[in-house]
Amino acid sequence: MAAAPAGVGRLEEEALRRKERLKALREKTGRKDREDGEPQTKQLREEGEEVGKHRGLRLRNYVPEDEDLKRRRVPQAKPVAVEEKVKEQLEAAKPEPVIEEVDLANLAPRKPDWDLKRDVAKKLEKLEKRTQRAIAELIRERLKGQEDSLASAVDATTGQEACDSD
């Protein structure tokens, strides 16, 4: 039997040590509770009860028979008209129809090599300019060659006419 009180004493000592550690933690974190260790929520509840004692009795759903209580009765609350607010919110929530022009090039399926053509297009522009210049130069050379042959043909025909007139 002597062991039982010693075990209880040890448990009480451990409980006191835990309380001290918790108190030290509360002080460290800045929480301030009552010294008797009651939690803060209990303190707030007790303070609320004190304030509640000083408030007047309000009767909302109870129809009293006593004249004194009838004076304390709260009138029926009228519901607030929310139809206008709801209509405004519904109108604000309606999405405005967005009409965009549809680009058929974006909708049509593309050929498998479209990206290659896009990449090569810049290089082809440079080559196209060179090609046009080369074609123009070839045409000029032919015209010069034809002018020379035309001039010789004209000279030849004039020479024959001169011979014929002799």
UniProtKB/Swiss-Prot annotation:
Gene label: Ccdc12
Modified residues (N6-acetyllysine): K53
Sequence position, cross-link Glycyl lysine isopeptide (Lys-Gly) (interchain with G-Cter in SUMO2): K94
Species classification: Eukaryota, Metazoa, Chordata, Craniata, Vertebrata
Basic and acidic residues composition-biased segments: 21-53
Modified residues (Phosphoserine): S149, S165
Disordered: region residues: 21-55, 146-166
Transmembrane segments: none
Alphabetized Pfam families for the sequence: cwf18 (PF08315)
The name this protein goes by in its record: Coiled-coil domain-containing protein 12
Coiled coil regions in record: 8-28, 115-144
InterPro entries: mRNA_splic_Cwf18-like
Modified residues (N-acetylmethionine): M1
Keyword check for Phosphoprotein: yes
Superkingdom of the source species: Eukaryota
Keywords: Acetylation, Coiled coil, Isopeptide bond, Phosphoprotein, Ubl conjugation
Signal peptide: none
